[in-house]
Amino acid sequence: MLWNWVALVGGIISAVVFSYILQAAYFHELSLLSAVILGIVLIAALALRAFAGKKSVQASYFASTKVKHELRSLIYRKLASMPLNQVNQQSTSSIIQVASEGVEQLEIYFGRYLPQLFYSLLAPLTLFAFLIFFSFKTAIILLICVPLIPMSIIAVNKIAKKLLAKYWSIYVGLGSSFLDNLQGLITLKIYQDDAYKAKAMDKEAEHFRKITMKVLTMQLNSVSLMDLLAYGGAAIGILTALLQFQNAQLSVLGVILFILLSSEFFIPLRLLGSFFHVAMNGKAASDKIFTLLDTPVETQQSAVDFEAKNNVQVEIKDLHFSYSEEKPAITGLNLSILPNQLSVFVGKSGCGKSTLVSLLMGFNKAQQGEILFNGQNALNIDRTSFYQKVSLVSHSSYVFKGTLRENMTMAKIDATDEQIYACLEQVNLAQFVRDNGGLDMQLLSRGANLSGGQIQRLALARALLHNAELYIFDEATSNIDVESEEIILQFIQQFKQQKTIVMISHRLANAVNADCINVLDQGKLIEQGTHKELMEKQGAYAEMFQQQKDLEQIREVANA
């Protein structure tokens, strides 16, 4: 704002000098020396205006950049402070939209609209205070016309606020639908439902187009009204000055100044009106941003550190959990997971295996019952200390874009190359890494340049480097090659003597050597024991095991 005002002062000085030169020339009073001096002053005033204008742009840029950085940092810190189950409740597309375009809109609000708002109030008062010495009548007419633009802005604001709130709501909804359909495109293709979803998206896109056109129409009408008021007000001021000059009530210098400076009364407010539309869009975005920032974080009551130095024992007591009231996912579950053993959970799809993992990891919170880790209630354990002692290797392990070293050191930031290679050796990846550039090997997002088995082995190596006390494998061997599956299973068998291991598996052959097999059905524990004990019992486990064995034999014959 200050630099804008300095630029205005430079403009006033240049207008005065230029007007004086014209007046002196009109009355034949301009000497060569005075012309040179006045020319130098004019150039200096114009240079001051240009310099101040440049500094104003720079100040606006630095202010808006700082606001943008601070807002995105606040959003990141807010999401980082939330427990994972609360983060999962947030819409991914909504977060992306408010953190990207929403913040960009607010950047304009803070970087341009607010400085222009204060300058728009200061500029007419400065010009009035200067021009009043030449003609009070013309100066007061110009000043009276100035409030007409803010009045039009206030009138438009009432319409714009509701319209832009609706616009952003539809925009975020369209983004959510697009992301959901894109992520589920393969499933839609399989079930031949993609055409239906395409039509639904066409309707949403058309709805968004209509609301966008309404916003543009409102903005164009508002701009036209402000142009009429701005240039109409300037024309009235100039006409009044000319009439006073005709009646010998205003000097040549004065009339030229009014001609040159009348528009300066209105240009700042006219620019404010232009920024206003973007600012209102940013205001609508800010409602979404501050709704996220004001979301209460689910905090733990008297959180304590997780005490797990060597052995971890897990006790589950009367556990109940459901995603909806109609269908419970876990019902009255009671069991113990003993330290330094391999405990495997099996069952049909939808029996509650992965739900149990989400409860063990704290991604979801049980409605009833408790989970105890070494006697400590999971609800009272500090999440940071908990995740230092527990590692999860899921069927969808994520590989980040960057070097292999960067991916590995996420588990241990100060890990040496020797420690990383030691972990890679245990999953039979060390030689592959050496042959492909070593630890500086570039990995694509989601490990696009690795096979599914290599991704899982890399995830296991990363978990090993983390050196947790409790390892949870959630379908870690599903949909990978036989070699990688055997490497992972052999490692788990060797590793179970040192750590507590929980494994979720749909393939029962992987559970044969487990110390304890837990069979789930509709969220309940229906059988428990070793492979031998459960086969002798001839219950649900034995039936599923035999069915899978028969299917695998049929597949082998078909592939032979």
From Swiss-Prot:
Superkingdom: Bacteria
Domain ABC transporter: from-to ranges: 314-547
Subcellular location: Cell inner membrane
Transmembrane segments: 2-22, 32-52, 108-128, 138-160, 168-188, 223-243, 249-269
UniProt xrefs under InterPro entries: AAA+_ATPase, ABC1_TM_dom, ABC1_TM_sf, ABC_transporter-like_ATP-bd, ABC_transporter-like_CS, P-loop_NTPase, Type_1_exporter
Domain ABC transmembrane type-1: 1-281
Membrane topology: Multi-pass membrane protein
Keyword annotations: ATP-binding, Cell inner membrane, Cell membrane, Membrane, Nucleotide-binding, Transmembrane, Transmembrane helix, Transport
SMART domains: AAA (SM00382)
Ribonucleoprotein found in the keyword field: no
GO cellular component, one term: plasma membrane
UniProt-annotated binding residues for ATP: G347, K348, S349, G350, C351, G352, K353, S354
Any one Gene Ontology molecular-function term assigned to this protein's record: ATP hydrolysis activity
Bridged cysteine pairs (disulfide): none
Sequence similarity: Belongs to the ABC transporter superfamily.
Protein name: Uncharacterized ABC transporter ATP-binding protein HI_0663
Organism of origin: Haemophilus influenzae (strain ATCC 51907 / DSM 11121 / KW20 / Rd)
